[in-house]
Amino acid sequence: MIRIAIDAMGGDFGPEPIIEGVVQALEEKTFQPILVGDKEEILSLLPQYYIDKVEIVEATDVIDMSDQATNALKRKDSSIYKAVELVRNKEADAVLSAGHSGATMTLATLRMGRLPHISKPALATLMPSLGKNKTLVLDVGAVTDCTPQNLYEFGAMGEAYVEKILNIRNPRVGLLSNGSEDSKGNALTKEAFVLLKNLRGFVGNVEGKDIFNGKVDVVVCDGFTGNIMLKASEGVVTTVFELMKQYIRKSLPAKIGALMMRKKVFANMKRQVDKDEYGGAPLLGVDGCAIVSHGASNAKAIKNAIFQAILFTESGVNSQIEELLSEKE
């Protein structure tokens, strides 16, 4: 049975949505959750029926969102530190946290270690697309200052991930740039372009719009660019839906039309862009599975993050990454 260490104290809303998400996940899938945090508080929120279905590891400290990620290594009694240690010590297969993302990534990288041939891990996320499948973008925040070699490794990891997780054969990998021509880009992307040509699925430079139009399956960028893209996209989605609501309220025919489209159109659209459907972002390149969830995650997001951790662990994606990069040496 897959064992998942879950930081029960991380997140903006405390342990309640996390425990609720664990309960929802247990109702649908078989796995062993290990809740790390204040045992008394966890037990007070856990329904009686599920008490014997979880393990609890006591942690007396919580790393707040305002704390420095660099201090995470010193906070050995924190819930996220102890959760990561369970994976390091092979007592769990995966770790999940909606807490301090910087601390989670730091601890996962330094305590769990990196896969062979990986110099830096990358945070990966799936973006909605007009194509048959969603588009994987990496890095979206783990490494702000990248080398060309980092970007090459990101491309290889992304290729392996979508093959194993999304079952896409011969995935197309693009390098995010300011134009699709081979000559476009800055010093970093131009050097990375040469390295990425060694990947069988590399199709060249892509523009921001190509993330969403189905042109490629994987988009590679540095964490600084990727994080800006991710947050800008979230803002666009929020704005578009709010504008739609405003215009619908101003017109009776629009209200009637919206009512007719509510279930089959709007509900499906919302599902495509709802971050809670994705649950969290895997930190690719670490020796194990680490899922970083949004601080504002609700129970649905936590449930889906757990499902993502289960799928990641079962897929053997890390072995695929190692194999792919060892072939290129």
UniProtKB/Swiss-Prot annotation:
Query: Main EC class of this protein?
Result: transferase
Q: Which GO terms describe its cellular component?
A: cytoplasm
Coiled coil location? none
Q: Which family does it belong to?
A: Belongs to the PlsX family.
Q: Drop me one GO molecular function for this one.
A: phosphate:acyl-[acyl carrier protein] acyltransferase activity
GO biological process terms, alphabetically, are: fatty acid biosynthetic process; phospholipid biosynthetic process
- UniProt-listed SUPFAM superfamilies: Isocitrate/Isopropylmalate dehydrogenase-like
Known catalysed reaction(s)?
A: a fatty acyl-[ACP] + phosphate = an acyl phosphate + holo-[ACP]
- Give the principal location in a single coarse category: cytoplasm
The UniProt function text for this chain reads: Catalyzes the reversible formation of acyl-phosphate (acyl-PO(4)) from acyl-[acyl-carrier-protein] (acyl-ACP). This enzyme utilizes acyl-ACP as fatty acyl donor, but not acyl-CoA.
**Whom does it interact with, and what assembly results?**
Homodimer. Probably interacts with PlsY.
What EC number(s) would the UniProt record show?
2.3.1.274
InterPro entries per UniProt = FA_synthesis (IPR003664), Phospholipid_synth_PlsX-like (IPR012281)
Alphabetically list the UniProt keywords. Answer: Cytoplasm, Lipid biosynthesis, Lipid metabolism, Phospholipid biosynthesis, Phospholipid metabolism, Transferase
Q: Name where it's found.
A: Cytoplasm
Q: In which pathway does it act?
A: Lipid metabolism; phospholipid metabolism
- The identity of this protein, by name, is Phosphate acyltransferase
